[in-house]
Amino acid sequence: MSRSEDLFAKAQKHIPGGVNSPVRAFKSVGGTPLFFKHAEGAYVVDEDDKRYVDYVGSWGPMILGHGHPDVLDSVRKQLEHGLSYGAPTAMETDMADLVCSLVPSMEMVRMVSSGTEATMSAIRLARGYTGRDAIIKFEGCYHGHSDSLLVKAGSGLLTQGVPSSAGVPADFAKHTLTLPFNDIAAVEKTLAEVSQTVACIIVEPVAGNMNCVPPAPGFLEGLREQCDKHGVVLIFDEVMTGFRVSLGGAQGHYGIKPDLSTFGKIVGGGMPVGCFGGKREIMGCIAPLGPVYQAGTLSGNPLAMAAGLTTLKLISRPGFHAELTDYTSRMLDGLQQRADAAGVPFVTTQAGAMFGLYFSGADDIVTFEDVMASDAERFKRFFHLMLDGGVYLAPSAFEAGFTSIAHGDKELQITLDAAEKAFAALK
């Protein structure tokens, strides 16, 4: 028995399913989840001392790679001054100033402790601002595990083959309207009929929880136009895409300004954190300025602020995102070439430093239906073959992959060598 197998068996005694987030259980790929004990640069090391090139990156935050010395130093220095105060700090203001300077639409920011808190709070704020109850989301898009958003969601719910979650009252779900991603005509039709009840549209500008599906040409522009027309708040969920697709997030890359945005992952440099913000007029409705309540004991935690500030400053250097995107493109091109040579139907998608891998004969992946039509069984085999070759991918056919600035030519070669053997075995 491997160390991971032993630990997984022990974990299941007191932890439901043996994991603290469902996708980690390897349910969709089979086998025993790997238990990690160390990470450095582009690599993770499991409890059996096996080393893997990491394309999960803690599900997105580790854009600098694991254990960047400057980030670790900033956290160590803050540790000397305390773990948490439950009171304002200078770093919170510094973080708000930096986020507003980097993201085109941000005028005010509120820090929270997770991406789920950020999206939940942004939706509450949109409802308070507009006085309306309904929200529009899109099939396969995941915005955290708050009740009203677990309707036809992506991420772990797709991994488990569950369209929504038990425990969500029908009275909550009835306020959530779900439309096809990348279908602006469906948005136009729905708003023409019920716009007076809709507080907001929330969307991942790049859908990163049904693998990685970029927006179709005109889709984000159409959302902005329709929200302006009907007085609906447009929320970009940039928990995944923020500071990764570009320094200014997906909104900076595509040139579309939402009314509110949510962030997480990179903004905390690997520490638990989230934030939401946007137009000053809307943010002024939140307590203590306005009637919309939101609070959090650990919001603006100084350790998270220290790690996040250092990370954002490091990724702001000229050329950083160009290098990151170039590596991602070269890696995906290499995978496609090897799949084609082996005669394996395979499609990749990319948005900056995030990517999707699909075993599909489609020309492109544009819709939720395209994602669901891909061969999840073949991905399952590919995942384990890549593990055997020393490459750790997301353990689900419905999760995006992530690269870091620590990935270089050596990691690229390991990845492509493993893929060549894997595709040959999949013929």
Curated annotation (Swiss-Prot):
Localization, per the record, is: Cytoplasm
Q: Copy the pathway line from the protein's UniProt record.
A: Porphyrin-containing compound metabolism; protoporphyrin-IX biosynthesis; 5-aminolevulinate from L-glutamyl-tRNA(Glu): step 2/2
Q: Which reaction does it catalyse?
A: (S)-4-amino-5-oxopentanoate = 5-aminolevulinate
The protein's required cofactors: pyridoxal 5'-phosphate
Family matches, as Gene3D superfamilies: Aspartate Aminotransferase, domain 1, Type I PLP-dependent aspartate aminotransferase-like (Major domain)
Which Enzyme Commission numbers does its entry carry? 5.4.3.8
Q: Chief localization class?
A: cytoplasm
Which biological processes are named by the entry's GO terms? Answer: protoporphyrinogen IX biosynthetic process
Annotated Gene Ontology MF terms? glutamate-1-semialdehyde 2,1-aminomutase activity; pyridoxal phosphate binding; transaminase activity
Sorted UniProt keywords:
Cytoplasm, Isomerase, Porphyrin biosynthesis, Pyridoxal phosphate
Its GO CC terms are: cytoplasm
Positions where N6-(pyridoxal phosphate)lysine occurs in the chain: 265
Q: Which InterPro entries does the annotation name?
A: 4pyrrol_synth_GluAld_NH2Trfase, Aminotrans_3, Aminotrans_3_PPA_site, PyrdxlP-dep_Trfase, PyrdxlP-dep_Trfase_major, PyrdxlP-dep_Trfase_small
List the SUPFAM superfamilies: PLP-dependent transferases
The record's similarity note reads: Belongs to the class-III pyridoxal-phosphate-dependent aminotransferase family. HemL subfamily.
Subunit annotation: Homodimer.
Q: What's the protein called, per UniProt?
A: Glutamate-1-semialdehyde 2,1-aminomutase
Organism (species) = Pseudomonas putida (strain GB-1)
The gene that this protein is the product of is hemL
